[in-house]
Amino acid sequence: MNTLSYKTISVNKETAKKEWVVIDASDQVVGRLCSKVAKLLRGKYKPTFTPHVDCGDNVIIINAAKVVFSGKKETDKVYTRYTGYPGGQRFNTPAELRKKEGGVERIIRHAVKGMLPKGPLGRSLLYNLYIYEGTEHKHEAQKPKTIDINQYK
């Protein structure tokens, strides 16, 4: 056998087979859920993974309002943001964010963003993530398949 004939397969944007998947986030720990979602967005579970190409799946998270934190993070963890004005540093705990509209989405999106590559590719991968607090989503036309996130490492 000629080992030089084996070429590494590199996927590009046109040949990447992107799928739509639905994940039920009920009673899932935020960090563990988001690390698996980040791998799905990146395409790490596919045999054709290419580091510099968007070859991951489009991920829809439903029941995001039912995610849980381990330990006392619900009350002790602090999210910091800055308004842009002097003295405009704001602090929120996950318990406070849950009360606000879109707060649970911000919690999950913040966690996934930290687990994706920093740079243009990571920012574009974040557009493939759709988060809904209830059971309904508006992507039925894409025929997403429901997966059990607990089967992934």
Label for each model-derived stretch:
Residues M1-H110, P120, K143-K153:
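Ribosome large-subunit tunnel/peptidyl-transferase-proximal elements
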Residues I108-R109, K113, L126:
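Hydrophobic, well-ordered secondary-structure segments
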Residues G122-Y132:
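C-terminal structural segments of small proteins and small subunits
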Residues I131-E140:
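Short, highly charged C-terminal tails/helix-capping segments
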